Amino acid sequence: MATVKEKLMTPLTAGIKVPNNKISIVGVGQVGMASAISILGKGLCDELALVDVMEDRLKGEMMDLQHGSLFPHTHKIVADKDYAVTANSKIVVVTAGVRQQEGESRLNLVQRNVNVFKFIIPQIVKYSPNCTILVVSNPVDILTYVTWKLSGLPKHRVIGSGCNLDTARFRYLMSERLGIHPDSCHGWILGEHGDSSVAVWSGVNVAGVPLKELNPAMGTDKDSENWKEVHKQVVDSAYEVIKLKGYTNWAIGLSVANLCETILKDLYRVHSVSTLFKGMYGIENDVFLSLPSVLSAAGLTSVINPKLKDDEVAQLKKSAETLWNIQKDLQDL
């Protein structure tokens, strides 16, 4: 006896089994799920896969998203602890990792994350050898280096979310002072995603007008308007949000979706993301830091070479040295 489906439809051909724009997210914590909902909201993928070791949480998050399938334009939402579910991904977003314990050194934290990544990264590459990996887990610059080493992928296909969010925070805070939209404020945060990031005051402009020409002291201790405070707010913002609500997730989730959109739609937009820095600005170690970079469907296709002041270069070198002093002591890479 024919089923309702058989009575309803006459099949003409089999559907396409391989997704065109699949995104997988490793880790369904606060950041992973904020990334998922931001990606779904933009309608970026035809399949979204979630992976985590916490099976009940994973199934619950999958079901919760599936129940809203009427609203976004993503046809298929799947989840499993087995990485086979990520097969044929265009982008794999890594948000998984261990949290820092009270009194724990940064080196020890990174080493514990290395041990986690030693399982995760080979599984990603096994099932999606042609994917671009977007690392979001912190400390993101070092873990992007770890991912690059463990994956065997070319450097243009291993990208850290880096200072994309720092730059967004910077532009938002500038826009609040100037009373205009963040889109109309042009400025960049480079270097480490974190305390030693570098605000490139020499390049800050609105409508092509360099703000340094209007206020030569901008970004220095001599500035009566104290624009330097804007960068301090960028650095402190994550700590402040964590103090207030326990974690950050929405802004980084939106940042991840922004990066995925540029890659999947082959937009060739410029983002401040973490990439291999060796050979630039006199840095000779294998460190990943953020530079303005062109992203496309091929991954990170070009790096912009900003004209930096001597003090800005010195700050980048200091960032690189800080990261290398941790990386050089990592085991089993």
UniProtKB/Swiss-Prot annotation:
It catalyses: (S)-lactate + NAD(+) = pyruvate + NADH + H(+). Keywords: Cytoplasm, NAD, Oxidoreductase. NAD(+) binds at residues 29-57, 99, 138. Its EC number is 1.1.1.27. Substrate binds at residues 106, 138, 169, 248. It is found in: Cytoplasm. Signal peptide: none annotated. Pathway: Fermentation; pyruvate fermentation to lactate; (S)-lactate from pyruvate: step 1/1. GO terms for molecular function: L-lactate dehydrogenase activity. One of its GO terms (cellular component) is cytoplasm. The active site is at residue 193. Pfam families: Ldh_1_C, Ldh_1_N. Disulfide bonds: none annotated. InterPro entries: L-lactate/malate_DH, L-lactate_DH, L-lactate_DH_AS, Lactate/malate_DH_C, Lactate/malate_DH_N, Lactate_DH/Glyco_Ohase_4_C, NAD(P)-bd_dom_sf. One of its GO terms (biological process) is lactate metabolic process. Homotetramer. Belongs to the LDH/MDH superfamily. LDH family. Interconverts simultaneously and stereospecifically pyruvate and lactate with concomitant interconversion of NADH and NAD(+). This is L-lactate dehydrogenase B chain. It comes from Columba livia (Rock dove). The gene is LDHB.
